[in-house]
């Protein structure tokens, strides 16, 4: 009966029983080699781990660990792997969703079945649990575990392999001159009958050669176009070999690798890491004594706050002041450790989206963070019920302080400040106007003019959801005690439409030359700009102009991507980083010269007169900027590979801006060299095309 049912399913799928049976072997000795790729993420293949380790998925490279033998028949078979031989086979540790597939001894192997799908792919299931299927659990590139066989991520395609005709790749590598941080070299793209796969090359384990086992009568192409920053690659002296039929005797090629000694891009974190955990959300700052700090999310849960554990990690330059070289960094340190499911208090579940500022006088960094277990859209401050108790998107604060005695930086434990900030958004009747919010991640701005008490004033802006609705908008906050207490900049207003940016997404602030404050908020095609003008600096009294869309009233415009970016002012030049593609790609820095007339500091005037410098043409997203110890800009941003790796690059604008002279006020007096580097005058040459 089972055989009749299986035959019917194969007919529906449009595949003959004879063809399907070609993937099965009666014994391992005369086994039919099979390559298995995911039907949804077709560039990813099923790979064996080492003996005793979980099977996994990865970009298809057609190497020995991707070649399988299905010994048995459609009613029941066991899976062996070419790299491990006949003593090991695939074993499931259970039959329920989430059960891992490991490479165990032959005696422990799990009996499996396949079920054909309407699109011609197959679900691979334990015989005792046909409702579950092998799945790239958590997404492409993750370990193989069981999940519902109805999920399309658990459907697979089979190709038989001709083991006699191989693609053999030899490697010639000259690694001298590479930056220490850039240990991944790039992807060697392999195209098999139009289907893409890749071998990722790492300088720490470059093999002498790689042997790839290909399908019968395959056409094969090879490309080295995707070298990562810091490296150059070619295949047989060219960028690529176009797809062609595999010769009878196979194909041998040479991959030549050299370090790009002119490269200045550095990967502070490749994403995902070796555990499959991604990084995201960059923030960068330069301290008073000239250290550069890079802080970002580390996401064991794989996603934003609200999905589980998220941590904050930091690296900083090992040198500062005159000794700063911009190329050497400390090892990563976790400064806020989310506890995920182990959290005994809600706010300790995770910490993410760092917003940071380094004080211009003290060797101290303030880090503000969203925290907790609530998705940003679902916070309900002021609207809790018995069925849905109040649980807003929570907020935390920590500091990183320089120990003068030890010469090291020490982070304080995070502390929750949720209920220090949310009450700012209640009106006189006690009604909450904001149900959920977080501070725009990246750089918190610090005034160079306004000092009330011991600290110069700092500014941040919040993404906020109106209580009782899903409408997001922005407000700005300021602090005169370096984040100990916060106040609303401007009036709360009566409703959503009275906010500084009624439709704004993730926002940032920057001070303009007269002390007024620019709000720059995320939107597709451009930014929302608004400006707060002071009538009294000390009491922080003043008014907002009204938000404008820069792409509608000016020339700060780009593709449809809707992505976090950052404004930064150096003297009389205003910068704005943001991706420029329709998708998240092409992170660039826009810039414009500011007039010395405060009457021009309006949202509409500030939307005009921009020019652009493209930093990357690759997939890229969020970004943050700081002024480096040498007066140039440090850009910390998200870029492929992964979604996303964290990339730092110094940008020397004296070689790229239009001809002008600008005054660069460094944010520190160097406590090491004691030279008081407070003002630098740079003459700009070599204008570029807009």
Name each region found by the language model.
Residues 46, 175-201:
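Short, ordered, surface-exposed loop/turn motifs in non-cytosolic proteins
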Residues 194-214, 237-248:
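Short, solvent-exposed S/T- and G/P-enriched segments that are highly enriched in secreted/extracellular
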Residues 167-177, 181, 190, 255, ...:
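A short, amphipathic beta-strand motif
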Residues 1-21:
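Bacterial Sec-dependent N-terminal signal peptides
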Residues 21-164:
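Lectin-like carbohydrate-binding module/patch detector with strong preference for beta-trefoil
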Residues 165-172, 223-225, 242-262:
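Conserved "repeat-terminator" motif of extracellular CCP/Sushi domains
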